[in-house]
Regions:
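Non-catalytic, topology-defining segments of multipass membrane proteins
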Residues: 1-200, 246-393
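Generic hydrophobic/packing signal
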Residues: 56-58, 204, 223, 233
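Membrane-interface module
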Residues: 90-94, 224, 241
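Active-site-proximal inter-transmembrane loops
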Residues: 145-150, 209-235
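Interfacial helix-loop-helix junctions of multi-pass membrane proteins
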Residues: 205-210, 242-247
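Short amphipathic alpha-helical "interface-anchor" segments enriched in bulky aromatics
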Residues: 235-243
Length: 393
C-alpha cells in the first residue's frame, strides 16, 4: 500500500459521538421503552428540542452565518447560538467555515471537506470519523464571523454550552417531570442522533438523489422528500447556485419552514435585509441548463436538422434576452448612483426619475415573462424531438 492509500487514524472523540451514541440509542431507547415506557410529555419535548436544534442549524448556522442570507437581531443570534450548540455539530465558527469551504470547492476531493466525489458514506459522516485534516484550524474564510461577539462567545464556551444543552437541560426537564432516565434517553440521546443524521442527509443524499433543474456544474440535487426531513434544506441544487438567497424552496408550495421562520422574524423586527434572487436570474439558470441538455441530446441523434435549427434560434433569442437584461441592470445601477449622489433633487427630476424607474420595472417584468414563455417553447420543442426519435426507433 502506497502512502497516498494510507488512511489517517480515527478521531476518537468523533467516533464516540457519531458511532457510539447511535449504538447506545439503538440499545437503550427500546429497552427502556419496553420495561418502563415513555409518555406523551417526553415525546413532545423530544420533538420540541429536535425542531429548535434543527432550525437553529438551518436558519442560524447555515443561512445566517455561513451565507449571510439575511441579518438577525442580537436576540435571534443568541437563540440560534444556544440551540445550535444543542445540535452538537461544532461551534458556529467551525461549522460555517467548513461549509463555506464546501461551497467554494464543491465536489473537489481534496479541498471540499465532505466531497460527494468520495462517496455517499464519506460525505454523510466518514469525513468526520478520521483525522483527515490538520489539527490547526483555518478560519481565513470567516474573518467576518470572528468579528461577531455572539459567534466568538459560543466558540470559546462551546464544550460547556453543548454539554448543558444535551445533558443538563434534559436532566432538569426529567427532574421536573419525575423521570430523569426516560427523558434523557428521548430528549437527550434519541433526539440528538436523529438531529445529526437529518443534517448529514444534506451533505450526502442531497448530492446523489434528486433533480438538477438549475445547474449541472456540481452534484447538488433538489429533493422534496429530503426538504421535508431537513426543514427545507432539500432544494439543494437551487441552494448551490444561489447560496445567498434566504430561501431554499422558492415556490409557495415548496416545504421550507426555515424560510417561513426567517420571513416571520422579519415581520417582528428580529430579522432584516432578506436576500432574494430575482426571478429573471432563476429563469435564466433553468433555461441555461435546459438548453445545455437539449443540445447534448440532439447532438447524439442523427438528422432532425429543422429541430436543431429551431433550438439554435431559441438559444440566440435567449442570448438576446440576457444581453437586454444586462443593459437594463447597468442602466438601473447608474440611475440609483445618480440619485444617491444628489444629482436629482428637484421635484421635476424626481418625477421624471419615478416614471423612468417604473418603465425600467416594466421592462424587467417583460423580460421575465419572455423567459417564462421560452421555457414553454423549449419544452414543446423537446417533446417534438422525443416523438421524432420514437418514430425513428
Amino acid at each position: 500500500m502506497n502512502q497516498a492509500q494510507i488512511k489517517p487514524p480515527f478521531n476518537r472523540v468523533n467516533m464516540a459521538i457519531f458511532v457510539g451514541l447511535p449504538i447506545a440509542a439503538l440499545i437503550l431507547v427500546p429497552l427502556w421503552g419496553i420495561y418502563q415506557g415513555y409518555d406523551t410529555f417526553q415525546w413532545l419535548w423530544a420533538l420540541v428540542f429536535l425542531y429548535l436544534n434543527g432550525m437553529s442549524i438551518t436558519g442560524g448556522y447555515h443561512r445566517l452565518w455561513a451565507h449571510r442570507a439575511y441579518n438577525a437581531s442580537p436576540a435571534l443570534k443568541w437563540f440560534f447560538a444556544f440551540w445550535g450548540a444543542g445540535a452538537l455539530q461544532n461551534s458556529i465558527l467551525i461549522w460555517a467555515s467548513d461549509h463555506r469551504r464546501h461551497h467554494r470547492h464543491v465536489d473537489d476531493n481534496i479541498k471540499d471537506p465532505y466531497s460527494a466525489g468520495r462517496g455517499l458514506w464519506y460525505s454523510h459522516m466518514g469525513w468526520m470519523l478520521r483525522q483527515y485534516r490538520s489539527n490547526t484550524p483555518d478560519f481565513s474564510n470567516a474573518k467576518d464571523l470572528q468579528r461577531d461577539p455572539v459567534v466568538m462567545w459560543q466558540h470559546e464556551h462551546y464544550v460547556v454550552l453543548t454539554t448543558f444543552m444535551n445533558l443538563g437541560l434534559p436532566v432538569l426537564l426529567g427532574l421536573w417531570h419525575g423521570d430523569i432516565i426516560g427523558t434523557v434517553l428521548l430528549v437527550g440521546l434519541l433526539r440528538l442522533v436523529v438531529n445529526h443524521h437529518v443534517t448529514f442527509f444534506i451533505n450526502s443524499l442531497a448530492h446523489f438523489w434528486g433533480k438538477r433543474p438549475y445547474t449541472e456544474s456540481n452534484s447538488a440535487r433538489d429533493n422534496g422528500f429530503l426538504a421535508f426531513l431537513t426543514y427545507g434544506e432539500g432544494y439543494h441544487n437551487y441552494h448551490h447556485i444561489f447560496q445567498t438567497d434566504y430561501r431554499n424552496g422558492i415556490r409557495w408550495w415548496q416545504w421550507d419552514p426555515t424560510k417561513w421562520m426567517i420571513a416571520a422574524c422579519s415581520k417582528v423586527g428580529l430579522a432584516s435585509d432578506l436576500n432574494r434572487v430575482s426571478n429573471f436570474k432563476i429563469q435564466r439558470a433553468i433555461l441555461d441548463t435546459a438548453f445545455s441538455r437539449a443540445r447534448d441530446k440532439m447532438a447524439e441523434a442523427e438528422g432532425n436538422d429543422s429541430l436543431k435549427n429551431m433550438l439554435e434560434r431559441e438559444y440566440q433569442l435567449f442570448t438576446d434576452f440576457i444581453n437586454q437584461w444586462t443593459a437594463l441592470r447597468a442602466e438601473s445601477y447608474e440611475r440609483t448612483r445618480e440619485q444617491l449622489s444628489g444629482a436629482l433633487e428637484e421635484k421635476k427630476h424626481r418625477l421624471q426619475t419615478k416614471w423612468e424607474n417604473a418603465a425600467l420595472h416594466t421592462q424587467f417584468k417583460t423580460l421575465e415573462y419572455s423567459l417564462k414563455m421560452q421555457r414553454k417553447r423549449l419544452g414543446l420543442l423537446m417533446e417534438q424531438f422525443n416523438c421524432h426519435q420514437a418514430q425513428m426507433a
